[in-house]
Amino acid sequence: MLSWGAANAQNSSAQVGVAAAVVGEVKLSNAQSPKPKTVAVRERIALADLIQTGKGGRLQLLLLDRSTFTIGANSVIRIDRFVYDPSRGRTSGATVVRGAFRFMSGQSNRGNSAAVSSPVATIGIRGTILEGVVGEGARDIAKHEDKAVREADADKKTATLVVLRGPGAGTEPGAEVGAASVTSGGVTVELTEPMQAAFVPRAGAAPIGPFRISPGGLSSLHDQVFPEKSGGGGLGKALLGGALIILPAVINGGGKKPARGSTPGPNDPAGVPGKP
């Protein structure tokens, strides 16, 4: 387990979202509580919290703007930044130390931006759905992709693979596909079409891409984010079944009817179930 130092003490108590779904071992630690504790459904997640999932653990984090951050097993993430103004949009940032993840933008794309960092890359996200994996899982997928990707000298701990998925069926009407950018080694690669991918093999290397991820690679990535075998059932049923349960009473204190989003499957070429 990783731990926090005193330098992070100032980043505490500012709520960024809640744990919307939890399966298996999911632990949380921060500067005030350096000893990891078990995360429960509806638990509030604060700025600078470090979240770690175990071998069978998975978590869906619902942010205040109704964006969602889902992490698979054996993953480590930290929410570094979150600014939300309903009238002006929001900006958020997270660090994925290792493991697989999915980020889905909230109901409105306008004025929203997000950034996800890995040990070797910075990923900008603008109004879309993005999946990625950091570490050995990224390297394993890369071995079966285009020649430039599979022959890259990839580091098994830090290699980073990113795939643009596009908006889900539950996104606000009129929402566009959005875009993502991957920056490393002073070079930026833009992903503007669903299923475009970029691969950063190691620190200091420029991103390889954009390239279209293979069906096998996409399936492997999807399995890392949403494993079919979900020991505790809750997250597997909610996400694999295509339903995202919003918890408005926890997020904003209101009593509105829960909203539902959609989770694209690995074979949805445009990132929208049932659409070509």
What are these regions (language model features)?
Residues 256-276:
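Short, low-complexity, Pro/Ser/Thr/Gly-rich segments in the mature regions of secreted, periplasmic
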Residues 232-237, 245-262:
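Short hydrophobic alpha-helical membrane-entry/anchor segments
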Residues 8-229, 244, 248-251:
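Flexible, surface-exposed loop/linker segments and immediately adjacent secondary-structure boundaries
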Residues 4-6:
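N-terminal signal peptide c-region/cleavage motif recognized by signal peptidases
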